[in-house]
């Protein structure tokens, strides 16, 4: 039973898909130079332009009426070299890289500190970072660093030992078939609840095990090689035979898992059970043993996300030979720690997760992985340092004003909807007025006093960090929900909506150009951060978020007729995205990406309305030859400036609920009438949709 701090468990709906979480080894100096140069270019996009529009990326050979993304970003896409240690590169990634470098500066300032008192933040950051940077020590220890864990697995004599290991290893983030998480009860958000969810796959999605498309067949081949190589390097015999058995086991698990589309329905995923009901659902699983090892009281109520999975998984668990489960646990444990077990194991991990599945050419330099690991284990300690140096107080004040303007615009739009009844409108407005914004950084920081960091022992530090995070969650079980907590650190370039707390959250790092520029006029800011704000508010009213009310309670507040009308519009938008050919005949999954597409369309539409309201009837100035409306849409399109390796694009089409950036830019714009007026889009143009085919939801 593994505990993971995941967006899936906590129902956080982020603006941008996170990069694959995998530690990688050293990259070349050229990669760093390329990254730094591009970061500088992107960070300076608007600093010298009153309009806030970076025209250097424009492709003048493309008409904005035919392909708006390519017009705004085409030259940048053609001329920008992909950093060798990246699967994708664009606005988000460049700002993320800059944030990473800013954090590195902060970390390295304390990494040489002397005479530091034990237990202080400086000591913890210094010793954790330095232990990671000691590559020679990691290579010298190799798999021996986790030998005690492997010996404990080898000593297991029955399935009860397997269930116990699911929990004890799960505390360290080891992947197992039973996932546990602690978060607000979706029907009683002030109470913490225990969620039980399907888990346990190594490949990115069940499709990789069950479908025969080229990328999935290749994925299975990569899996077999990776598992074989891991076993061989760790000193196990017959690695290829073990790999075949594990692929068979994970395929059986994949067959009974819910699809990503099914997992979007939170009402079906809310299934409260006590221990007796769990035993009745899956009698083959010794739930009590697992929960005891996980330090969870067995008299708790458990919210089971996918009951049919556990019914079938119980049979798989009991029918699978014990030795296969021990191999599974051994492999998953080694794979979890492989990036920090020395050069050879790190290379195996990189070759599978990054090079094989995402097409990355070279491993990241060790300092990047070290910074990421410190961020993972004590992110809010670094966050405090980051905010002190890099966040401007005036940004918070201006963001708060924009958020209130977006909420006012949503109110106007909801009242004006011609397809929604007054009854549902009032419920929607009640929810809208209960949104809680969080901007920049937490009011209350995590207390890391109980986190022990030792000098020169990387594996112990990582285990301590993950155990600390696990214990913080367990401690919540007998306490009220603390809604001051954040799901992202201030140094994260992203934003999110949490439906159970009905909050929209904007970390400090996203409040910079091209999203938010204090030097630019309002048009580009409403097209950038304004649309981001609108996007996150829109998640409260997408096909998933609309199931929660203003207090974060999972309940149906829609009339049946209004719900049906919403679905008609949602399905029409999904059909549009289904028709976008992305790469090699592969298209977007419109239903899977539905929530993000609704967020984009609502965000852009409402941000435009808020921008027009901010003008208070005045005419916007023409700046750099662009009208205010044109600058608004140009600001929107330049936010999505991005490119990706083919393998990464294909992977994301399978696992990422966000559409590819180009289709986020174009897909929303073609449904907004003001875009047609701003750029004189007419029938026959590539960006033209007949009025009757344009979708308006909010």
Question: Where are the regions a protein language model picked out?
Answer:
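Post-signal peptide N-terminal segment of mature Sec-exported envelope proteins
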Residues: 25-48
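Bacterial signal peptide processing site
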Residues: 19-21
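Noncatalytic, helix-rich "gating/capping" subdomain that lines the substrate-entry/channel surface
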Residues: 110-401, 405
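Bacterial N-terminal signal peptides that target proteins for export
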Residues: 1-6
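Hydrophobic/aromatic-rich, well-ordered segments within soluble, folded domains that form packed cores
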Residues: 58-78, 209, 213-232, 594, ...
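C-terminal motif of bacterial Sec signal peptides marking the signal peptidase cleavage site
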Residues: 14-17
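Intrinsically disordered, low-complexity linker/terminal regions across diverse proteins
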Residues: 42, 46, 252, 281-285, ...
């Amino acid at each position: 039973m593994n505990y993971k701090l995941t967006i899936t468990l906590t129902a956080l709906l982020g603006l941008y898909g996170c990069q694959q979480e995998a530690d990688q080894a050293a990259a070349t100096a050229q990669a760093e130079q390329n990254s730094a140069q591009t970061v500088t270019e992107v960070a300076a996009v608007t600093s010298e332009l009153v309009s806030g529009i970076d025209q250097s990326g424009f492709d003048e050979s493309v008409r904005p009426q035919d392909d708006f993304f390519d017009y705004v970003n085409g030259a940048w896409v053609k001329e920008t070299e992909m950093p060798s240690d990246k699967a994708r590169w664009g606005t988000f990634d460049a700002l993320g890289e800059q944030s990473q470098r800013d954090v590195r500066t902060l970390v390295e300032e304390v990494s040489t500190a002397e005479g530091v008192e034990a237990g202080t933040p400086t000591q913890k950051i210094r010793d954790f970072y330095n232990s990671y940077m000691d590559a020679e020590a990691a290579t010298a220890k190799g798999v021996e660093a986790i030998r005690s864990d492997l010996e404990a697995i080898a000593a297991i004599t029955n399935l009860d030992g397997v269930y116990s290991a699911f929990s004890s290893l799960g505390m360290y983030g080891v992947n197992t078939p039973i996932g546990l998480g602690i978060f607000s009860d979706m029907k009683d958000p002030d109470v913490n609840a225990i969620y039980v969810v399907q888990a346990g796959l190594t490949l990115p999605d069940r499709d990789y095990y069950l479908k025969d498309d080229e990328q999935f067949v290749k994925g299975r081949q990569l899996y077999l090689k990776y598992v074989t190589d891991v076993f061989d390097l760790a000193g196990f015999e017959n690695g290829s035979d073990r790999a075949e058995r594990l692929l068979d086991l994970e395929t059986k698990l994949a067959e009974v898992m819910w699809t990503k589309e099914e997992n979007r329905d939170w009402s079906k995923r809310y299934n409260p059970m006590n221990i007796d009901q769990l035993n009745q659902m899956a009698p083959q699983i010794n739930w009590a043993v697992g929960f005891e090892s996980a330090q969870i009281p067995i008299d708790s109520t458990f919210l089971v996300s996918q009951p049919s999975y556990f019914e079938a998984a119980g049979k798989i668990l009991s029918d699978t030979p014990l030795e296969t489960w021990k191999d599974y646990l051994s492999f998953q444990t080694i794979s979890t720690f492989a990036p920090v077990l020395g050069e050879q194991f790190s290379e195996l991990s990189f070759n599978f997760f990054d090079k094989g599945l995402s097409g990355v050419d070279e491993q990241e330099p060790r300092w990047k992985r070290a910074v990421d690991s410190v961020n993972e284990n004590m992110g809010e300690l670094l966050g405090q340092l980051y905010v002190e140096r890099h966040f401007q107080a005036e940004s918070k004040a201006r963001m708060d004003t924009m958020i209130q303007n977006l909420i006012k615009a949503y109110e106007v739009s909801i009242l004006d909807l011609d397809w929604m009844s007054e009854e549902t409108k009032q419920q929607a407005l009640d929810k809208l007025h209960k949104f809680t914004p969080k901007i920049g950084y937490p009011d209350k920081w995590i207390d890391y006093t109980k986190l022990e960091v030792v000098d020169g022992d990387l594996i112990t530090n990582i285990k301590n960090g993950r155990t600390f995070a696990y214990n913080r969650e367990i401690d919540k079980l007998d306490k009220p929900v603390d809604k001051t907590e954040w799901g992202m650190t201030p140094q994260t370039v992203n934003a999110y909506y949490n439906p159970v707390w009905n909050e929209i959250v904007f970390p400090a790092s996203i409040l910079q150009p091209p999203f938010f520029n204090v030097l630019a006029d309002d048009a580009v800011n409403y097209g950038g951060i304004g649309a981001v704000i609108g996007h996150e508010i829109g998640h409260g009213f997408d096909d998933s978020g609309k199931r929660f009310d203003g207090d974060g309670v999972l309940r149906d507040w829609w009339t049946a007729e209004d719900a049906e009308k919403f679905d008609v519009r949602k399905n029409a938008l999904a059909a549009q995205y289904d028709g976008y050919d992305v790469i090699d005949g592969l298209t977007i999954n419109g239903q899977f990406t539905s929530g993000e597409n609704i967020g984009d369309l609502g965000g852009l539409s409402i941000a435009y309305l808020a921008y027009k309201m901010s003008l208070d009837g005045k005419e916007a100035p023409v700046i750099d030859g662009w009208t205010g409306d044109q600058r608004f849409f140009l600001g929107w399109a330049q936010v999505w400036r991005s490119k990706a390796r083919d393998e990464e694009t294909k992977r994301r089409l399978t696992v990422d609920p966000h559409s590819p950036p180009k289709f986020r830019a174009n897909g929303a714009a073609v449904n907004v009438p003001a875009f047609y007026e701003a750029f004189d889009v007419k029938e026959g143009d590539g960006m033209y949709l007949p009025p009757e085919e344009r979708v308006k939801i909010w």
